[in-house]
């Protein structure tokens, strides 16, 4: 399993809750992440959405968690509670060169959210943006259901 492998390869990793005081560390990490990924329109839209979420972190009552190794943020996840049953995992970023980082931040963030909001029943992991690898990863979590996504222009 990816998490077990990550723990073996990175025994000194830590988690840290994202706060307004350390949010800049996530901004710095995601900037580095975008530097090594090929630009496309979806990436640009995601980048804008993440920037807005950072700007309004407190106002929209977001939660976040970072994975840290040797003082460096190697992954983070952020989301917000939708209602008493649903939680929306809005963003998850990790360095893909670090085996298991995505699986580990997913697991640790899910555990944090389950502890903070024990009444929750569903985590919305959002859509796969048409990326086959992301779809495969999200389907590996055996979702309860998949919803159709629609765009509306006003």
Name every feature range the model reports, one short phrase each.
Residues 63-154:
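Aromatic (often tryptophan-rich) hydrophobic motifs at membrane interfaces
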Residues 7, 55-58, 139:
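Alpha-helix boundary recognition
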Residues 20-27, 44, 128, 132:
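An alpha-helix initiation/capping motif
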Residues 2, 29, 49-53, 108-109, ...:
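Short, hydrophobic/aromatic alpha-helical segments in well-folded domains
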Residues 1-39:
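Acyltransferase donor/substrate-recognition loop-hinge adjacent to the catalytic core
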Residues 25-73:
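Short, conserved active-site entrance elements at the starts or edges of catalytic domains
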Residues 5, 32, 56, 112-116:
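A generic secondary-structure signal
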């Amino acid at each position: 399993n990816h998490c077990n492998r990550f723990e073996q390869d990175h025994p000194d990793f830590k988690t840290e809750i994202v706060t307004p005081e350390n949010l800049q560390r996530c901004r710095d990490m995601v900037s580095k992440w975008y530097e090594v990924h090929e630009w496309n329109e979806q990436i640009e839209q995601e980048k804008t959405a993440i920037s807005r979420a950072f700007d309004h972190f407190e106002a929209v009552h977001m939660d976040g968690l970072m994975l840290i190794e040797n003082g460096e943020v190697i992954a983070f996840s952020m989301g917000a509670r939708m209602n008493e049953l649903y939680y929306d995992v809005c963003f998850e970023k990790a360095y893909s060169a670090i085996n298991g980082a995505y699986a580990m931040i997913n697991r640790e963030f899910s555990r944090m959210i389950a502890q903070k909001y024990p009444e929750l029943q569903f985590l919305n992991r959002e859509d796969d943006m048409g990326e086959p690898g992301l779809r495969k990863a999200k389907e590996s979590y055996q979702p309860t259901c998949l919803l159709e996504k629609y765009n509306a222009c006003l």
